[in-house]
Amino acid sequence: MSKAKFERTKPHVNIGTIGHVDHGKTTLTAAITQTMAARGLAEFKAFDQIDNAPEERERGITIATAHVEYQTDTRHYAHVDCPGHADYVKNMITGAAQMDGAILVVSAADGPMPQTREHILLARQVGVPAMVVFLNKADMVDDEELMELVELEVRELLSSYDFPGDDIPIVAGSALKALECGCGKDDCDACKPIIELMNQVDGYIPEPERDIDKPFLMPVEDVFSISGRGTVATGRVERGIVCVQDEIEIVGMKETTKTVVTGVEMFRKLLDQGQAGDNIGVLLRGVKREDIERGQVLAKPGSITPHTKFKAEAYILTKEEGGRHTPFFNGYRPQFYFRTTDVTGICELAEGTEMVMPGDNASMTVNLITPIAMDKELRFAIREGGRTVGAGVVSDIIE
């Protein structure tokens, strides 16, 4: 069978398998690649190939993640699967593998377990927009009522974390049986649930908005003045497009100001516009060199606002990862590194949390001493004197 070439014509979506340990996430991932390979839409990846995921470093944090890719008739997917629970926590908090949607795997034989709950909570906090459920090991449950009970329990759990539990598609099957068969045919009892699952993923998980279609934002990395021309701010465009003559805002650190883009340049060439992913210099009208600094952002007016107080989910590095050796307590004052700059902040731990140990993930409220342009889902590092001791994500903005 000739290998299908990667067609850029289909929309690309990033998904991942989440759920409790041993409920079958990796087996399901292997079964999806095998079923799609039988249909000429993927390359089969065996369980062992996925399970022995290489370790990657993201912001100084070691995360083991397996990446597989496959297509359906309508989409191209990049799928992440993590071997260990801690890897999921780190992955979701750092955004190392951005998920546009998730497949929540729940063993029909066991029902929802502690990590099922924790992964749903994390998905909610880090802004995974949608999920589809696979009730795995359905072959081990011969009682129809028991299956319905587990499904009900999963729906209630999802609803309790503000996911639309009543509407989320749930597909029951056996990933192992599908993997053992591997024919990938619609009428096969073993493979049908995998095909049905992917149809639901295709239909239910929304296509992500591309970075280029979002409102313009560029974190300022450097500023210099060009005599006779004015002030230039340089950085990598995070999202959107900026054109010459656009009105933009300078947000964060101090009062928000408005200005007009009088030039865009890249590799010393003048352009009409810069777009997401480009490293550019932006020439700003009437802005003095001292009016703008690293840590601020240039943005489409009204699209982002500066804040000092927010709720966050954070993962605190272990000693082995180069983090702290000791726990921290309420009132901890590290630096929070947002995009290009460090800002001191004070941590208020969630009620009932006495302290946070290295290796924990924790919910906290942070009060920064200087305002930073932020949205929900913005990622940050927690640092002490330039050394990364944690990673986090803004889950809610307070003020």
Curated annotation (Swiss-Prot):
Annotated region described as G5, given as residue ranges: 174-176
Primary site of residence: cytoplasm
Protein keywords: Cytoplasm, Elongation factor, GTP-binding, Hydrolase, Magnesium, Metal-binding, Nucleotide-binding, Protein biosynthesis
Record's protein name: Elongation factor Tu 2
A GO cellular component entry from the record: cytosol
tr-type G domain sequence ranges: 10-209
Region described as G3: spans on this chain: 81-84
EC number, UniProt record: 3.6.5.3
Molecular function via GO: GTP binding; GTPase activity; translation elongation factor activity
Subunit structure, as described in the record: Monomer.
Location of region: G1: 19-26
Cited InterPro entries: EF-Tu_GTP-bd (IPR041709), EF-Tu_GTPase (IPR050055), EFTu-like_2 (IPR004161), EFTU_2 (IPR033720), G_TR_CS (IPR031157), P-loop_NTPase (IPR027417), Small_GTP-bd (IPR005225), T_Tr_GTP-bd_dom (IPR000795)
Region (G4): 136-139
